[in-house]
Amino acid sequence: DLPRLQYTEMVIKEAMRLYPPAWGTTREAIADVELGDYTLRKGGVAFLNFWGVHRDARFFPNPERFDPERFNPENEKQIPKYAFLPFGAGPRVCIGNAFAMMEAKLIVATVAQHFRFELAPGHPVQPERVFTLRPKYGMRMIARRREHS
């Protein structure tokens, strides 16, 4: 049933757009490279800010708004190739990305069948940038069992 979990995948992608697991990375230039008006010399290090790219209004209108429809099949085609990087890209892309997405879809769909989650009132949501991006104060949630008929 994984192919039928399209909306679940859209929700997960939008969550990773707003809160990418890896919020940035560095790359060392193996040759001189021109980046706009700037020259990065061989051996120089560039920081790639996934967090910033994911919240850039040029790529994602109303970037602070949670909108899974950004990732419906038609809309997703409009996202530039390197504007969505929750697992990195290119030769160093995370080799576990397909497995991680499959696992996330199964977990989210299974749990969401039985529970609704709401953020606890007044609980601050503040990302903390360490090696990975995580909630500084955790995520206090209220779980409510779904009524099944």
What are these regions (language model features)?
Residues D1-Q6, C94-G96, R129-F131:
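Conserved, non-catalytic sequence blocks in retroelement Pol enzymes and Pol-derived host proteins
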Residues D1-G36, A57:
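Conserved cytochrome P450 K-helix E-x-x-R motif and the immediately C-terminal K′/meander segment
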Residues G138-S149:
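C-terminal helix/juxtamembrane-tail motif
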Residues A98-R134:
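Cytochrome P450 heme-binding "Cys pocket" and the immediately downstream C-terminal segment
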Residues L2, L48-E76:
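Conserved cytochrome P450 K-helix/beta-meander segment immediately N-terminal to the heme-binding cysteine loop
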